[in-house]
Regions:
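Long C-terminal interaction/binding lobes of large macromolecular proteins
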Residues: 187, 206-208, 216-236, 246-250, ...
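Extended, highly charged accessory segments
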Residues: 283-352, 366-367, 410-411, 418-704
Length: 704
């Protein structure tokens, strides 16, 4: 709306802007776009008031400043509710806990317990963490209770909007006893009829757990009820960490993005569409936002030059989007106007193909990368229905209903959510309590068998310790390092270690990671001691080495694809004539290579590299982890068999090489072998501990 000249009259008498769920925008480019839009509105209507609402944010002062901006003339207040919303959290503990857990079966072993909980309430939301899991859980529940057909539904972001709207209204009307969903129902709709929420698998963050719990009992004076169903044993620790954080009001902070130039390039064109402006007018308005409060003059000049000349792309007319006429910036080309208005926004995703019945309505969307692998006759799940692919034509996957078992399950990007830093600290504290044999809540008492075995065969690290395990067998040499900092940090640590080792020793090293640690695996001996690990995990030349270790050029190229879309350098096409992902990738690569060759100092290239470090690799958390490790005592244990800590990493290593069914069969076989080894341990647990200390402690190193 702000790109049209009529907006000046439309918003002139606006009095109030209310931004709901501000925490969901803060720290994302959608939030940056909101800040810029609010700055534009404040220019049009100087007396407008801004309100922000949030129930789950840790850094409330920062949220305030980013919302009201830098030029607020009136005082700004934070209003806190004095009503304490109670959250009743119930943990469903498995009847038998695997002492060798793995994160591959998405908790379906708890299906009976989930169905029993659904039966105990009038209306339930069953949250999973990914769209893929939502499809599988919906089918599993329906197979177990076919009489619930028509009474349960599915909801996620890749379903057709009309289907999602129908499900939301059916919840409000009390027509459904359960809905299996993802974060698509975290926000936006109030469901007073919902009695309880079931969370399958760890939410990976305290704020997300509170947000989802709040979907139940959504009326004044009512408490929220959340039932937590762990997908594997270690997630019980994550729940206790989250429960403790909630009781202590420790909610994750949202890290703000500082002055992204792709958003500013887009905004410069949007402003020029509505009304010609001078440079100083543009600079003052942009600097009134919190994100761009320190925008340098040279960066502003670069943005305005880029939208007028295209920089090194000046030979191409499409990049001359804004004209400078008598000191004013304006858009005079109608083709530019149409193309830009269709591209406004900061939400980017993989190219989606619509899924539609041959004779009937639309079902939803799958990513092009998944659709490209489908063959005629392939069966897949979407929207809780089993579909058979007939053909793909003109950007649409045409299907018919079918029966049997799926031969493919759609997978969408963004499936792995890393453990938040606050929750990771809580996990380490509980593991420390277990190591010190302190009194534990009942939920963690259920893990005693698993943890006793970890202590017997290896070690349980305390807060000031770093555990390293090593296992050599006929398949190769495996080294496990446990940081308990989340998947993103584990990926960074693993890549850094493998890169630095490979510079000094010739060896083929593969990496496996999870939220708790990493595994380096080599067919030949890795030959690493604690002193070498401490050396390789120093912060010396950290940024250069981490970029080199992860093929920084390719990572930057992928990140640049999103930046180029937001900045308007590539276009997804027009309605009915969308471009394929292959075409967009080729276009992005051409622009990227041209800038690298002819304009290596281009600020959008710099932004892409910076986002790879800060967002994808979370280098700030990586630095904090390395600092903590430098100050810790290192414990090195040579293993005779896989431990409860190392077993999930072993599963991650072989997962990509084996199909799901074959993987489950192989994992169960290895679990049985390890359980037999446990049962044959000679003597009592006390005697075994003495033997372990006598043998294992001889192979333990500490910091030199």
């Amino acid at each position: 709306m702000l790109s049209y000249p009529e907006s000046l009259e439309t918003f002139k008498h606006l009095r109030t802007v209310i931004v709901d769920e501000w925490h969901e925008l803060l720290g994302s480019k959608r939030g940056i776009q909101t800040e810029l839009a609010l700055a534009r509105i404040s220019r049009i209507a100087p007396t407008v008031r801004r309100w922000g609402l949030s129930a789950t944010i840790g850094n409330i002062d920062h949220a305030k400043y980013s919302l009201v901006g830098q030029s607020a003339s009136a005082p700004c207040s934070i209003i806190r509710s004095d009503q304490q919303r109670l959250i009743d959290i119930e943990l469903v503990i498995p009847q038998a806990i695997d002492r060798f857990p793995w994160a591959g079966h998405i908790g379906l072993v708890m299906l009976k317990e989930v169905i029993a909980k659904i039966e105990s309430a009038n209306s339930t939301l069953v949250f999973t963490n990914t769209r893929n899991q939502t499809e599988l859980w919906y089918q599993a529940i329906l197979r177990a209770r076919p009489d619930w057909a028509g009474q349960i539904a599915i909801h996620h972001g890749s379903l057709a909007p009309e289907l999602r709207t129908w499900v939301e209204q059916a919840i409000v009307d009390g027509k459904l006893i359960a809905v299996v969903c993802t974060s698509s129902l975290d926000l936006g709709v109030d469901f007073a009829p919902v009695d309880q929420v079931i969370q399958v698998g760890s939410p990976k963050g305290t704020a997300r757990l509170i947000q989802r719990a709040g979907r139940s009992g959504h009326s004044p004076g009512r408490s929220s009820k959340l039932v937590f169903v762990p997908a594997h044993a270690f997630e019980i620790i994550e729940l206790e960490a989250a429960r403790q954080a909630i009781s202590q009001k420790q909610i994750e902070q949202r890290r703000a993005i500082d002055a992204p130039l792709d958003c500013l390039v887009q905004h410069a064109v949007t402003m020029a569409l509505a009304k010609p402006y001078a440079k100083q007018e543009f600079l003052e308005e942009v600097r009134s936002t919190y994100a761009y409060r320190n925008l340098a003059d040279e960066h502003c000049d670069w943005v305005l030059d880029f939208v007028t000349t295209g920089g090194c792309l000046h030979a191409y007319k499409d990049f001359h989007r804004v004209a400078l006429d008598f000191g004013k910036y304006a858009v005079i080309d109608q083709a530019v106007s149409r193309r830009h208005r269709m591209s406004i926004g900061t939400i980017t995703s993989d190219m989606m193909l619509q899924v539609q019945y041959l004779k009937g309505g639309k079902i939803g969307f799958v990513e092009e990368s998944f659709a490209a692998k489908l063959k005629e006759g392939d069966k897949f799940l979407l929207g809780g229905k089993l579909l058979e692919m007939v053909w793909i034509r003109e950007g649409t996957v045409w299907v018919r209903k079918t029966k049997g078992d799926p031969t493919a399950v759609p997978r969408w990007l963004g499936g792995n959510m890393p453990l938040s830093s606050e929750l990771a600290l809580g996990v380490r504290r509980w593991i420390d309590a277990i190591a010190r044999k302190e009194p534990l809540p009942d939920s963690l008492q259920a893990l005693c068998g698993l943890m006793d075995l970890q202590r017997l065969w290896s070690h349980i690290p305390r807060l000031d310790e770093v555990l390293v395990e090593r296992l050599t067998n006929r398949e190769g040499d495996a080294l496990m390092l446990y940081g308990f900092e989340g998947r993103s940090v584990s990926e960074g640590l693993g890549a850094l270690l493998a890169y630095r080792i490979s510079k000094e020793r010739k060896n083929t090293i593969s990496i496996a990671v999870n939220d708790y640690g990493l595994m380096l695996y080599a067919p030949d001996s890795i030959g690493i001691d604690t002193k070498s690990l401490v050396h390789w995990l120093s912060q010396r030349e950290l940024q250069a080495d981490i970029l080199s270790s992860l093929n920084a050029t390719e990572l930057t190229r992928r990140r640049f694809r999103d930046i180029a879309r937001i900045a308007g350098l590539i276009h997804s096409g027009t309605p009915g004539q969308s471009k394929s992902m292959r075409h967009l990738q080729a276009s992005t690569s051409m622009v990227f290579d041209a800038l690298k060759q002819y304009d290596p100092a281009n600020l959008l290239l710099w932004q892409a590299s910076d986002e790879v470090l800060s967002d994808q690799l979370q280098i700030h958390r990586l630095k904090e982890t390395l600092t903590r490790m430098e100050e810790s005592r290192w414990v090195h244990v040579d293993l005779k068999q896989w431990t409860p800590f190392s077993f999930p990493l072993m599963v991650e290593r072989i997962r990509d090489r084996i199909g799901n069914e074959s993987l489950a069969q192989r994992i169960r076989k290895i679990q049985n072998q390890l359980e037999q080894g446990t049962a044959s341990e000679s003597g009592s647990l006390t005697k075994s501990k003495r033997n372990a200390e006598k043998g294992n402690m001889q192979s333990r190193d500490t910091n030199p």
